[in-house]
C-alpha cells in the first residue's frame, strides 16, 4: 500500500531531464535529429504530408523545425469553465490521447475527417479553429 509520505522513484524520463552523455547534456541533444528523421521517413513511407501533433509542446519540440512541405495540425481542446472556454491541461492531455485512439480506430488520414472527432463531449468549432489548429470545445468536464 502506498502511503502519502512514501518516496516514489521516477518511472519515466521527461524531455527536460538533465542527462549528460557523450551525445549531449540533455535528451534533446541525445536524440538530435534521429526522431525527426524517423518521423519524416514514416510520412514518406505512408505517402503523406500530414502530421497530426498530439504531443505536448515539450515533446513535439524534439522534432525541431519541421520542413515546410509537411502540414502540421495541432488540435487544441478547450473546456468551459467560469464563463469561458480555456485549455485545462489535465483535460487536454486526456483529450489528445482520446483523439489518438479515435484516429487509429477510424483510420483518419486527412484534416477534414479530423473535424468529425466527437469523443467525451468535444465538438469541432469552426469559429475558433485555424487551418493548423482545429479547436474542439466541451461544455462539461
Predicted regions and their residues:
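Internal, well-folded beta-alpha domain core
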Residues: 1-129, 135, 139-141
Amino acid at each position: 500500500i502506498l502511503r502519502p509520505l512514501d518516496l516514489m522513484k521516477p518511472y519515466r524520463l521527461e524531455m527536460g531531464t538533465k542527462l549528460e552523455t557523450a551525445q549531449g547534456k540533455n535528451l534533446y541533444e541525445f536524440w538530435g535529429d534521429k526522431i525527426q528523421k524517423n518521423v519524416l521517413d514514416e510520412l514518406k513511407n505512408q505517402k503523406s504530408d500530414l502530421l497530426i501533433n498530439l504531443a505536448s509542446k515539450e515533446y513535439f519540440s524534439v522534432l525541431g523545425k519541421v520542413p515546410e512541405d509537411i502540414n502540421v495540425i495541432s488540435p487544441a481542446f478547450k473546456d468551459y469553465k467560469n464563463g469561458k472556454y480555456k485549455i485545462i491541461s489535465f483535460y487536454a492531455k486526456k483529450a489528445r490521447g482520446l483523439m489518438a485512439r479515435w484516429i487509429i480506430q477510424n483510420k483518419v488520414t486527412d484534416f477534414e475527417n479530423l473535424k468529425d472527432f466527437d469523443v467525451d463531449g468535444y465538438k469541432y468549432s469552426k469559429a475558433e479553429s485555424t487551418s493548423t489548429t482545429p479547436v474542439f470545445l466541451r461544455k462539461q468536464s
